[in-house]
Amino acid sequence: LLHPKGRILEISSNGLHAERLESIVKKYPRTKVRFSLEGFGDTNNRIRGEQDGFAKKVAGMMRLKELGGQDLGFGAVIQDDNITDVVDLYKFAQEKDVEFATSTLHNAFQFHKNDNVVYDRMKVAREVEKLITEMLKTNKVKNWFRAYLNLGLIENILGHDRLIPCTAGKDFTFIDPWCDVYACNVRPDLLLGNLRRQSWDEIMNSPKSREIREKVKACKQNCWMVTTARTAMRNPLVPQLPKARPFWWVVVNKARATLGMPIPFAKYIDYGVVVTDESVPRREHFLDSKQVKRRKQTAEETHYSFVGKYFNR
């Protein structure tokens, strides 16, 4: 249904049952597949609450590669518990000839989370600098622009404003399994409509959607997720090309990396301003605290637990 219509189709998965994707990758090898991988061995397993998750994901990814998958990769959520693994994870992905994408902790109704914070913001931000430098050293254009995305991650981690304004509800939307269409998956108040009751055009051209797009312009969340940030980087006239600001940043700093010169991060990021969080209890890992029983929700159930304020700063 979607393959002939979507320019890019991505399946994001925990990677624990890669065999379920084999038939898709065989038939549609250009389908983008990303497995969540938060670190090596026990680091990944503890963060994600998985038994032998690291080994299963890597083996599954290699199997999809054998079957002819052309756009395969891992994705990591940068945080205190895995930051020292991130550069090595990137190099590991390079060795396996698969992609590597990053994001950082976010709070959102979709995730049922409002206590995700980076505890040592400065330490984590400085480690991301190393990842940016490594990406700029490669010969892959995609990695150069991922380096810019990671510059935006540093701003997010430090609590600064976004590098580029958000375009939620205009350039992208979030559709949940029950056909509700949201401008994004962070704010539950940005519900645009429902595809069971309305057509796509009715939803996107409605007065409610225009009102929500105005709310997005005033949003102070400062999220920086890969998919949404990448969309905001695109040139509105020629979507296949980047906007001028990220383009020239990449040109200048790729040249510096090629010549062996350091990237002047202090020129782009104000490290003198770091948001100080209220005292937040450190998160427990699922494998350290309890066993979580997963189950499927029905359409009639309440799907999201709105627990307090969702804030990303």
Question: Which role does the model predict for each range below?
Answer:
Residues 12-18, 78-82:
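Short beta->alpha connector loops
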Residues 2-7, 27-38, 42-172, 176-182, ...:
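Radical SAM enzyme [4Fe-4S]-AdoMet core and its adjacent flexible, acidic
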Residues 16, 38, 105-107, 197, ...:
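Residues that form or immediately flank small-molecule/cofactor binding pockets and catalytic motifs
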Residues 21, 35, 93, 100, ...:
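Generic structural signal for small/hydrophobic residues in well-ordered secondary structure
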Residues 185-313:
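Flexible mid-to-C-terminal extensions adjoining Fe-S/redox cofactors in radical SAM and related proteins
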